[in-house]
Structure formats: C-alpha cells, structure tokens
From Swiss-Prot:
Widely expressed in various tissues, including lymphocytes, liver, skeletal muscle and brain. Expressed by upper epidermal layers and dermal fibroblasts in skin, hepatocytes and neurons (at protein level). The modification Phosphoserine is found at S122. It comes from Homo sapiens (Human). It is found in: Cytoplasm; Lipid droplet; Cytoplasm, Cytosol. It is linked to Chanarin-Dorfman syndrome: An autosomal recessive inborn error of lipid metabolism with multisystemic accumulation of triglycerides although plasma concentrations are normal. Clinical characteristics are congenital generalized ichthyosis, vacuolated leukocytes, hepatomegaly, myopathy, cataracts, neurosensory hearing loss and developmental delay. The disorder presents at birth with generalized, fine, white scaling of the skin and a variable degree of erythema resembling non-bullous congenital ichthyosiform erythroderma. GO terms for molecular function: 1-acylglycerol-3-phosphate O-acyltransferase activity; carboxylic ester hydrolase activity; lipase activator activity; lysophosphatidic acid acyltransferase activity. This is 1-acylglycerol-3-phosphate O-acyltransferase ABHD5.
C-alpha cells in the first residue's frame, strides 16, 4: 500500500572516501535510487497505510523511519530494530498484524538501509554508544515518551544496550534471536574445535568487512545473494513471487559499508561480540520486563534466555520458542511471531 506521505526522497548516505568507495558505484549495479525502488517493492504489499520520513538527529545524520497507526495515543508504541545486513523492509510480513491496535515504528539503523552512513569510531564501546545515542536522539525527535523495544540479531543487542542506558524509556524489551550475548568459548572447551583451515581463513579475512565479497563481486553480487540465500525468497513467497527480497537485501548491503564497518569493530573472530551483553545485562533496571523469542530450528545458541533469567532472578524474564522457525523467526513463522509479540505488548497496555 502506498505511503501517506514522504517528506524528502531519502536520508543522506553519509561520507564516501577513498578509492574503493568511489569505485564501487561503477562496479556494483546499485545506487540510492535502486535501494529506494527495492524498498518500495518490499512495502507495496503491506496491507495498511503508513507514513515515512527521514528523522533528523545530530551531526547532520538522518534515520529513515516508517510510522504505522501513529495516531493511536493510548497505547505504548512498538519500535522495531532490524538485524545486521537488514533493513526495515524485512518486517513487511509483520507490519499489518502488529499495528492493528497500537503505534508501530520501524527504522533503518544508523549506517544501514536508507539511513545516513557516517563514519563510526574504531573502538567497540564507542561504536555501541554511537548506535545507542542515535536511537535516543531518534526517540526525542519523534517525541516518544516510552517504548516497547524489539530487536532482532544486532538490533537485539542494541535494544539491550539502549535499555541499560535509558531504562526509563523502555516499558518492555523483546529480544528476537539476539546477537552478541554470550562470550566466545575457549577453543579448548568446544566439543568440536574449529578446524585449522577455518581459523587460517578467518585470520586472512580479518582486515575485511563481513560483506566485502558482495561488493567485490560487482555485477555478479545479486546472483550471489540469490544463490547463497535462496531461503529468503521462500520465506516471503506468500507476498512476492519474484526476487524482490533478494534484490532488497543486495541493494541494502552494497552501499557504503558504514554500519557494516561498525559491526566489524564490535566483533572478534568468528562473529563473537567484543563486549558480550551477558556480562552486563544483570545490571539492567530490575523493573524492565524482558521477553526472549527464538526459533526452535535456529542455528544460533538459544540459551541466552535461560542465562538472562539466571542473571535477573528477581525480574520478569520469559523465553518463547517458535516451532518451525529458524534465525529469521519473524519471516519463517510470521503469524505465530506476530501473535506472540502482540500478546507481549498487551501485557504492557
């Protein structure tokens, strides 16, 4: 369904510098216009009206935002934070159900999608703080008092980090297959040690961003996404029969690698967090309820919910498993996911 309004074409793309980023537009068949068109295709089947706008924050940056049912004033708004390599368009299967009786906001994280793509610090703690402050500035700009904050993957990590720093703004924290919670296990403690060749490959790739290969592939990048992740087309088959989803993912991830670089600076080899959230979540304000949603078929460690419960013994923590779902639980089983999220939201108001 078409948006009700759009104030400007898009958020700024941020700085481009160096020979590589200057060369990318001529090698990769992409542009901000391509990303805009891909997003519009993702959203055209959303069965409800919405408004979209770039929300201005500090340093000239903008956060690309969708607003659903924003005129409902008696319910706490639900705010959706996407994961690494994603964008707000990936919630297309969820918007219609989630906004039936409360405001829903979704935005592209700073450095991702159609939000600004600034330079991030190289220090993991400072990068995390830059993300958190961008969320807080976004909240202030929209005049939201309190939120139900839901994050998937990297978005879950950032939602938890935000809740630690700004507890008075979060009425409920919903972690969906969150990244970055456990510490990296010692190699000697692993049941199946990482093969030497994988460790060598990991060391060789350390200087590069996680999705650099997609940009290096240039005009072959889109077919690479389609070949490596055919599951995304299947997940959204009820909404799209063509390659809309893989095209959106491709154009999200071959722009200037701003958020991607930030994520790399927050990780150690093999994708573990430099600053694991389980080391800190016990310090979260005890009055913030936490719900953890994971897919029963996910390859990601699903024990974070149990760990959070043990670290917050006197606070509300609930773990919910979605049968038949993997890591992208909101797309694998959207109806069940939407229902569980609505039930959680109804406990707030």
């Amino acid at each position: 369904m078409a948006a009700e309004e759009e104030e400007v074409d898009s958020a700024d793309t941020g700085e481009r510098s160096g020979w590589l980023t200057g060369w990318l537009p001529t090698w990769c068949p992409t542009s901000i216009s391509h990303l805009k068109e891909a997003e519009e295709k993702m959203l055209k089947c959303v069965p409800c009206t919405y408004k979209k706008e770039p929300v201005r924050i500090s340093n000239g940056n903008k956060i690309w935002t969708l607003k659903f049912s924003h005129n409902i004033s008696n319910k706490t708004p639900l705010v959706l934070l996407h994961g690494f390599g994603g964008g707000l368009g990936l919630w297309a299967l969820n918007f219609g159900d989630l906004c039936t009786n409360r405001p829903v906001y979704a935005f592209d994280l700073l450095g991702f999608g159609r939000s600004s793509r600034p330079r991030f610090d190289s220090d993991a703690e400072e990068v995390e703080n830059q993300f958190v402050e961008s969320i807080e500035e976004w909240r202030c700009a929209l005049g939201l008092d309190k939120m139900i904050l839901l994050g998937h993957n990297l978005g879950g990590f950032l939602a938890a980090a935000y809740s630690l720093k700004y507890p008075s703004r979060v009425n409920h924290l919903i972690l969906v297959e969150p990244w970055g919670f456990p510490e990296r296990p010692d190699l000697a403690d692993q049941d199946r040690p990482i093969p030497v060749w994988i460790r060598a490959l990991g060391a060789a790739l350390t200087p590069f961003n996680p999705l650099a290969g997609l940009r290096i592939a240039g005009p072959f990048g889109l077919s690479l996404v389609q070949r490596l992740r055919p599951d995304f087309k299947r997940k959204y088959s009820s909404m799209f029969e063509d390659d809309t989803v893989t095209e959106y993912i491709y154009h999200c991830n071959v722009q200037t690698p701003s958020g991607e670089t930030a994520f790399k600076n927050m990780t150690i080899p093999y994708g573990w967090a430099k600053r694991p959230m389980l080391q800190r979540i016990g310090k979260m304000h005890p009055d913030i309820p936490v719900s953890v949603i994971f897919g029963a078929r996910s390859c990601i460690d699903g024990n974070s919910g149990t760990s959070i419960q043990s670290l917050r013994p006197h606070s509300y923590v609930k773990t919910i498993a979605i049968l038949g779902a993997g890591h992208y639980v909101y797309a694998d089983q959207p109806e069940e996911f939407n229902q569980k999220v609505k039930e959680i939201c109804d406990t707030v108001d």
